[in-house]
Amino acid sequence: AETVFVTGNTAIDALKLTVQADYHHEVLDRINPARKMILVTMHRRENQGEPMRRVFRTLRQIVDAHDDVEIVYPVHLSPAREILSDNEKIHLIEPLDVLDFHNIAAKSYFIMSDSGGVQEEAPSLGKPVLVLRDTTERPEGVEAGTLKLVGTETQAVAEAMEALLTDESL
């Protein structure tokens, strides 16, 4: 009998169906197209509380230091609104469905996330991912250089963001 090996990832296959060249979302109307858009997701229980607050403060610091950067963060968590809501270059929006998320991810300069699914999908869009965790279940992405584990400590997150924003070779 012959052996058949099936490999792949249906989430990656879905990207081919959901990402659209003529995609529109109202948040994109509020973003200066000349700026680098960073998409952020952060939801894991391990990051709730102070780890999230550190990342949020770092996001503010980076946005304030870079005139050419805007952030899109689909969120309904109150700590994010408490720390980030009064900055015109940080767009807090309602959580996105998969079609919207894939298309906004495709338009992003890079992505910051603690989501395993995002770690799988973003590299297929050619987007680097700063992983807001100390570990990952996707070590192949780290080995390939498409994912960078940065955790939630302010200095590590800021240095990784600065590197992607300023080093054209990355």
Where is each model-derived feature located?
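Nucleotide-activated sugar donor-binding and catalytic core shared by glycosyltransferases
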Residues: 1-170
